[in-house]
Amino acid sequence: MRTPAGISEADFAAAIAAFESVVGKEWVFTSDDDLEPYRDAYSILRDEPEERIASAAVAPFTSDEVQAVMRIANEHRIPIYPISTGKNLGYGGAAPVLSGSVVLDLKRMNRILEIDERNSYVLLEPGVSYFDLYRAIQDKGLNLWIDCPDPGWGSVVGNALDYGGGYTHSWYRNHFEAHCGTEVVLANGELLRTGMGALPGAKTWQQNKYGYGPFVDGLFKQSSLGVVTKMGFWLYPAPEAYISGVVGVPKKADINALVDVINYLENTVSMQGMPVFASPFLPFGLPGAPPPDMPTYDSPVAEQEAYAAAHNLPYWTVTVSYYGAPEVVKAQWDYTKRKASAIAGATFSGGDVVTMPPKPEMLKGMNRSLFGVPSLSIFFIGARSEHSDPTQGHITCSPIIPRTGEGISEAYDLIFRTTKRLELPVTILSPPIGCWARTFVILVMIAVTEDPAKNKRTRAGFREMIRILAEHGYGEYRTAPAFMDDVMETYSFNNHALRRFHETVKDAVDPNGIISAGRYGVWPKHIREKKA
């Protein structure tokens, strides 16, 4: 049996026995076979000495059991790594950041505690997936939508806590911002409720997120301060109609004005859905060979624009979506065309009003997430789609960039040059993604292989890219465990004041440093002292 670093076999055996007395022997896992699912399937350290491996896993069923487990762990100083469903592919999966930690697997806590149709909210546990929530709403015949990411098998709570995003209305697709009220078990086993939940018998816990005094929910986003056992979310009242339209512009430089138009529409709530930008000339696009005569990303702009004109292709397009009453979405699409017509040569297509709910035949071949319907269709993109037993995964570089056309051009030029120079095995470079208001994120997916030598080179290049992007003002919002310290190192304003603040809070709330050590680059005092 593996043991955490610094813990004797006798003490660990005593803790395991105590865990078994709380959750039942069948829900404590220590064998290699049982711990295999808690390895990161996409780990760039897989089968290397540095791979992050759990020493055990415990699967509680209730908040009371979580409290008891945390008291035991705190007493024995056992490192604990909470997960919701462990589907965080590309960002660590179910594996701990600190090797030897005991994974606290919350997937058995899969209860939907309340769905309120009149006030459009839900209260649920961390084991509830987007599929679970969608089915519950459909089974009850409720007039509500969810906003879901790709893919839909993950935890609603887990995705929000890692700052995930979706596709529908701007008020809901920032999943952490759409939460309202959190229940947290602290390292000592104490139970905390945030916002109005701190008031016994509160009637508005899922309706007012701020409550009284400082807003502390953000301390549990991408955090190592507690174990979230309940979370409320605002849901989207099902819209009556939907419109999707496409705006195209002919010149590369037109992206500047196009983004400005879209920003205005979003910031005035004249458009609700996530804007999807695209260009046939972006590098490292989705799988599929481009025409042999098509200019590449680094071809002269004049050649690109001439090719686009000759083939009746816009240089840039943005797909826009609208949700609401039929007459409202029609007016919003007309308004979009009026605003975008100021760009010379702008073209428009689509714009048909579609009555909701969507018919099954309409969903075929479409991104179902646009309609709050979870799916696994994302796995039809890339290497895993063609192999039932794939041998590679990916890590993702996820820089946040300005929501301007100039920001798009500068960031893509930098990423293209950097990945080429570092010979990073890019599989997909996403278009600028606008799931959050005010910024874009770009997803740079880098292949992970079974070859340790290749993975070692990739790790070195990935770290260099993190540093270069940061030097140009682009910070990562999320990363795999192997690079969490590297990303935190870039957030260095005023001699790393942010990290030092995180450490101060960590040492106060979790003095024994047992929860998620190293997560997002925040280490407890006893490990920091060893590293010094």
Residue ranges and their predicted role:
Residues 2-9, 14-17, 25, 40, ...:
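Conserved glycine-rich FAD pyrophosphate-binding loop
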Residues 3-6, 55-60, 122-124, 245-248, ...:
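Short cationic amphipathic helices and targeting signals
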Residues 17-25, 75-78, 138-142, 184-191, ...:
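Generic secondary-structure signature for well-ordered alpha-helical cores
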Residues 44-53, 94-129, 171, 235:
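Glycine-/small-residue-rich beta-strand-loop submotif within the FAD-binding core of flavoenzymes
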Residues 65-68, 132, 252-259, 326-335, ...:
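Short, conserved charged micro-motifs
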Residues 110-117, 229-241, 311-313, 384-395:
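Residues forming anionic-ligand binding surfaces in small-molecule and nucleic-acid pockets
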Residues 112-115, 124-268, 532:
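FAD-binding subdomain of flavoenzyme oxidoreductases
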Residues 216, 232-233, 243-254, 258-372:
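C-terminal cap/substrate-recognition region of VAO/PCMH-type FAD-linked oxidoreductases
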